[in-house]
A protein has these predicted regions:
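Conserved SGNH/GDSL esterase-like catalytic core that processes O-acyl groups on lipids
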Residues: 54-59, 64-163
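A structural motif corresponding to the C-terminal end of an alpha-helix
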Residues: 141, 176-189, 214-221
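N-terminal secretory targeting modules
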Residues: 1-60, 64-87, 139-142, 263-273
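Alpha-helical scaffolding within the catalytic cores
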Residues: 128-137, 172-177, 209-210
């Protein structure tokens, strides 16, 4: 007779069960790790977005910049650098020496432009306003770039008296002007030379161009020779052989702007600090 021996309970393989449970858990953890690694750099990039770095620009000129040419130039500078970074001054009848502090104050009688982040004044009628001094403008606005549109009014002086002594005097004025425009900072300077004129002789126009070009070589600044991109046709371009009508002024400004874009890095994008 057989003794009743209870049947041995089936043995559970816990190691196989653990392996079965750990596999999906490991897969989930791996996916989480991959997502974290991929997302981390993009999060870092979002924390440092590209920030526009704008140059501060000061532009000064004569009656040509009081008129339409000045409108177009200012619109371009504001669209490129922002209104808070642009200051434009123009005084009808002025020459480089009139903007220098040691020289007597020049009062314009035919037009004035002053457009800054704080105010906007454009007057083309007869008045009696003092031309500001470039030393004060540089100290106030601290420009990175100074754009100059001056020189046409020297042609009157050279028409009546063009001597080596006179040209030496004007060369000295150029050097003083550039030194004042730079101040103590590494300011970039661009000189827009006078456009073509049917009133002044080619000799006088070339003399002014040569004075500015020689100063550019000595003092290391950029120039735009406007005579190469303009042609004054009496009755079409203007009436007096010197001043350009609105249409001609705008066309001249557009051609100048094309050259400015090739010459000056007025605005760029950089990784913010």
């Amino acid at each position: 007779m057989k003794t009743n021996i209870p049947a041995r309970a089936a043995r559970i393989d816990w190691s196989a069960l653990a392996r079965a449970l750990l596999k999906p858990l490991a897969l989930v953890l791996a996916l989480v790790l991959v997502v974290f690694v991929v997302a981390a750099p993009s999060e870092k990039k979002r924390s440092a977005p590209a920030v526009p770095m704008m140059n501060k620009v000061l532009m000064i000129g004569d009656s040509l910049s009081v008129a339409k040419f000045g409108d177009v130039m200012r619109d371009f500078l504001v669209s490129t650098c922002g209104a808070r970074n642009v200051a434009v001054f123009a005084s009808c009848g002025s020459s480089p020496e009139n903007w220098l502090r040691p020289e007597p104050t020049f009062f314009t009688k035919c037009g004035y432009r002053e457009q800054t982040p704080a105010r906007s004044v454009v007057l083309d009628r007869r008045l009696h306003l003092a031309t500001p001094k470039i030393e004060s403008l540089v100290a106030t606005y601290r420009p990175d770039t100074v754009i100059v549109q001056l020189g046409t009014n020297w042609m009157d002086r050279l028409t009546t008296s063009d001597t080596p002594q006179k040209e030496a005097e004007l060369s000295d004025i150029m050097d003083r002007f550039i030194a004042a425009a730079r101040g103590r900072r590494a300011v970039q300077i661009l000189w827009i030379m006078p456009p073509d004129s049917s009133h002044f002789s080619k000799r006088v126009q070339s003399t002014v161009e040569n004075l500015i070009s020689a100063a550019a070589q000595r003092d290391r600044f950029e120039t735009i020779p406007s005579r190469r991109i303009t042609h004054y046709v009496p009755g079409k371009t203007g009436r007096d052989g010197v001043h350009y009508n609105p249409e001609a002024s705008e066309e001249w400004a557009k051609r100048v702007i094309v050259r400015i874009k090739r010459t000056l890095p007025l605005s760029e994008i950089y990784a913010g600090q």
